Amino acid sequence: MSGGVIVVGAGLAGAEASWQLVRRGVPVVLYEMRPRKCTPAHKTGDFAELVCSNSLRAEALTNAVGLLKEEMRRLGSLIMACADAHRVPAGGALAVDRQLFAAAVTERLTSHRLVTVCREEITTIPTAELVILATGPLTSDALADELRRLTGQEHLYFFDAVAPIVTLESIDQDRVFRSSRYGRGDPAYLNCPMSREEYERFWEALVAAERATRHTFERETHFEGCLPVEVIAARGRETLLYGPLKPVGLVDPRTGERPYAVVQLRQDNRAGTLYNLVGFQTNLKWGEQRRVFSMIPGLEQAEFVRYGVMHRNTYINAPVLLSPNLMLKSRPGLFIAGQLSGVEGYVESAAAGLVAGLNAARLYKGLEPLVFPPETAHGALINYIVTADPANFQPMNVNFGLFPPLPGKRVRRRPERNLAHAQRALERLAAWLTEKGEG
């Protein structure tokens, strides 16, 4: 096959898909509309720009996303290579300096001899034999309409919410303490402890705060993993104590006791000058954010360098439309990757791009596309999105509940059980890659 593969979108999924193609010797034409046309959330023209959080979540193999990242490393992932090279302290998680990370991904692809970058908006789906659509949760209206016409399915909409960022120097260090939960890993988080009285005042202000106006054409449907903090708070007076303000595993060194509630701040850049409010994705008006979030102990005089915003997320009904190799059932050769495919999260999006890129490369070379084994994190996640109930389909993060049961007697302790899943997955992946000639 001649002419190469067209990849639309240079986010995490499109960048990873492009890399998997060129590392197998397949030429790529990569379309990215930014910076000529930006989305409501993106600020730059860099590839793989992170707009919500700078965390790629847990590192340990006892966490499913940690396993997914390790599988990606073993599959030659560009996203993981750049993330590892530009990580910042985050305890047991992998967090990155978002600017250095995106710049590294951009440089690796734009400098590659097999990559042709086109900085323009695509409003119709290319008619080429091999196309990967990786336009992400903020797919332009024109392309979304085109995809709707092609699939015959209505898109589902919900809102992702972006957390605010404050400067380190504006945080009152006398009111916060540095620690990770249960003392695990580096003491990477700044913790703002609250007494019961402080929490009650904060909760009352939060639920009464004015929210930004949404577009009338968008329904308010939230993914549970990225709920706005005010939506969580509105579910009950104590709901936040089991969510972003949970105090478990933390002890205030000044009192020797666990606080009633804790707001965690996570380093957002390598220099350590910026911190984001963990779990504080929000749709409050900016003035309300300053008023309410300044009630958090230690943030009374905080300088907000970015306020939270909300934006639409668009994804297809994968159980109806997608094959397990991520090709559209109605049009062989057209792959859907990233959050558009119905996976949720940075790492999951990149992983879907990896699978789409690998399979597009195989088709380009006249080989059969592959379906990852369900025992692997890649296989378990994709198996879920293509087999879930189409009537109630929601985006999904990777988790061990998606994996086939372990053989033999059930392991009772969760860490040991999860580690057994991870060990099986990595062994199965290695054998499968060798078997398929992808090792």
UniProtKB/Swiss-Prot annotation:
Keywords: Cytoplasm, FAD, Flavoprotein, Methyltransferase, NAD, NADP, Transferase, tRNA processing. The keyword NADP applies. GO terms for molecular function: flavin adenine dinucleotide binding; tRNA (uracil(54)-C5)-methyltransferase activity, 5,10-methylenetetrahydrofolate-dependent. It holds the Pfam family GIDA. GO terms for biological process: tRNA methylation; tRNA wobble uridine modification. Signal peptide: none annotated. Its cofactor is FAD. FAD binds at residues 9-14. Its main location: cytoplasm. It is found in: Cytoplasm. It catalyses: uridine(54) in tRNA + (6R)-5,10-methylene-5,6,7,8-tetrahydrofolate + NADH + H(+) = 5-methyluridine(54) in tRNA + (6S)-5,6,7,8-tetrahydrofolate + NAD(+); uridine(54) in tRNA + (6R)-5,10-methylene-5,6,7,8-tetrahydrofolate + NADPH + H(+) = 5-methyluridine(54) in tRNA + (6S)-5,6,7,8-tetrahydrofolate + NADP(+). GO terms for cellular component: cytosol. The keyword Flavoprotein applies. Its EC number is 2.1.1.74. SUPFAM superfamilies: FAD/NAD(P)-binding domain. Catalyzes the folate-dependent formation of 5-methyl-uridine at position 54 (M-5-U54) in all tRNAs. Belongs to the MnmG family. TrmFO subfamily. This is Methylenetetrahydrofolate--tRNA-(uracil-5-)-methyltransferase TrmFO. It comes from Desulforudis audaxviator (strain MP104C).
